[in-house]
Amino acid sequence: MSMNLPRFDAIVFDFDGVLVESVDVKTRAFAALFEPYGEEVVKQVVAWHLAHGGVSRYEKFRHFHRAFLGRVLSQVEEVELGNRFSALVEEAVIAAAWVPGAHEFLEGWHARLPLYVASGTPEEELIRIIGRRGMTHFFKAVAGAPRKKGAILRDFLGRSGVSQDRMLMVGDAMTDFDGAVEAGVSFLGIAPAGANPFPHGVPVLPDLIGFSTFLVASRPAFSAAERT
């Protein structure tokens, strides 16, 4: 294969922490929402949130109330929390910096490869944010919660006609990795030095600066077939 040709026919990105530096924005929002319950609860909320990137905020709300507050969250309360969370984060995510290398990659590759987004952010909000950041034209499709990553990836496989081993999921959380394994697609982790959550053998980059080189290198990405 020519070194100028990518080893994949479609790329799927998580959003927060992979394309945009927005993880801290959402961490602060969770902390603010649970601040009335005290410092210890806030610490538990933040730790669980950071350990479960890519999980829907609504799943997190339910877990936090059940595990840390000892009660079941009502549907009305869940909707209210979701609205408050969106109000805290949406403008900040729109204004957030790019992950290093992300904008350059999207600009340089969107006409060469079909690119997709699979996020734990509610889909309507995700589409608004991507639109207001001027990113819509980069992607063939954008999908978010309430669907899980595995289901989204299977949908993208069906839409694109790309074989599983020729689709690459790029994510920064085990939720992304697990979704890739479930859908049978290849995976690349994004993790800063010293903060790699992925199993041994999974390739990792610190950001997207070297992603173009990765795509045309002979070194393979993690394949879900290796788990079987």
Sequence positions of predicted segments:
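Short catalytic-loop micro-motif centered on adjacent basic/acidic residues
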Residues: 19-20, 116-117, 143
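Asp-based, Mg2+/Mn2+-dependent phosphohydrolase catalytic module
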Residues: 1-8, 123, 127-228
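Active-site nucleophile and cofactor-binding loops and adjacent substrate-binding regions
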Residues: 51, 119, 146
